């Protein structure tokens, strides 16, 4: 399960409570993964340059995640975007995160890839109308 940073502690506590009386366990793998967001109208084109996986709309619909080969390693690839454009979040293991990041930068150079800060992404999120737990809604809101 991938959860927003603002909801991490609450999600983990809820899952642990739910699993107490069951034959299940909760393991927090946060420290073992990095997050690299590739967002924008050419994100699919960029991603196709760094993976042999099919990243077409038919192969990976919005909201779906799967493991893909990328930059001599593997990463979870989640098709999601909070900026109002096509986008993907890559979750490589920590040991290949720098390699994946470098591959993204190299593949996006001629596509006009730019770094975007948190406030820029947040502004795009607001324009799109996506609500964010901890900013726009809280634990008592029912979106």
Where in this protein do the model-derived segments appear?
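Conserved, structured C-terminal
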Residues: 2-143
């Amino acid at each position: 399960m991938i959860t927003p940073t603002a909801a991490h502690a609450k999600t983990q506590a809820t899952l642990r409570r739910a699993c107490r009386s069951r034959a299940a366990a909760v393991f927090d793998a946060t420290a073992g993964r990095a997050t690299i967001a590739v967002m924008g109208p050419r994100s699919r084109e960029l991603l196709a340059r760094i993976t042999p996986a099919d990243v077409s709309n038919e192969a990976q619909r919005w909201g779906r995640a799967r493991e893909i080969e990328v930059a001599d390693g593997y990463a979870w690839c989640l098709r999601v975007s909070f900026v109002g454009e096509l986008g993907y979040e890559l979750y490589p293991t920590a040991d290949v995160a720098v390699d994946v990041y470098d591959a993204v930068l190299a593949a996006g150079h001629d596509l006009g890839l730019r770094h975007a800060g948190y406030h820029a992404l947040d502004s795009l999120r607001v324009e799109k109308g996506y609500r964010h737990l901890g900013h726009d809604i809280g634990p008592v809101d029912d979106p």
